[in-house]
Amino acid sequence: LGLDRLEQWLEGKACVVPMGEDMHISVRDHYARAPYHHGKDLALVEDIVREKYPDYVPAMEEYLSGTNCYFGNIFIMQKPLFDQYCGWLFSILEEFDRRADTTGYSTQELRVDGYLAERLLGVYVTHLRRTTGTQVYELPRVQFEPDNKKRVQRTLLNALLPPGSRRRAWVKKGRG
C-alpha cells in the first residue's frame, strides 16, 4: 500500500483507529490488573469525566465495561475532530494531574497519563459512534521488529497464543 493509495483511501474518513483487542475481561478490570497500572487512577479519571463531561458517561460505561480495548494511542482523525479530541483529552488529564497522588510511583508507573489516554481514546471513539453517527474505521495494527530474533519470537507467541484468544487472556490473567 503506497502513500498515494493510503491518502486516497483516507479521503472523507473522519476517524481511523487500530482494531481493538478482545481482552476477555472488562477494559476496567484489565487496567487494574496490568503491570504498572493502578485501578485508583482510572477510577479518578472516571470521576473527572462524570464531573466535566456528563454526556460522555454512557460511552465511558459501555467502553470500560466491554472487553474490546484500543491500545497504543494510535489514530488518524480529521483536524476538527482531532482538535475536539485533544481539548477533551487534555482537560481530563490536566485535572487528573492536579488531583492524583503518584508518590512512590516507579518511572514506568509515572507513564500513567499515557496509559489513561489509551483508555480515554476508546471512550471518545465510543462516544462518537453513539452520539454523532461518525463512522469509525478500524484497521489491523502493524508492528515492525528491528531484530529478526524478536520477530521470530513474536510470530511464535502469536501462533501459540493468538491476540484476542481465550488462551492468551488466560495466560495474561495468570500473570496479573
Residue ranges of each PLM-predicted region?
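ER/Golgi luminal nucleotide-sugar-dependent glycosyltransferases, focusing on the catalytic module
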Residues: 1-176
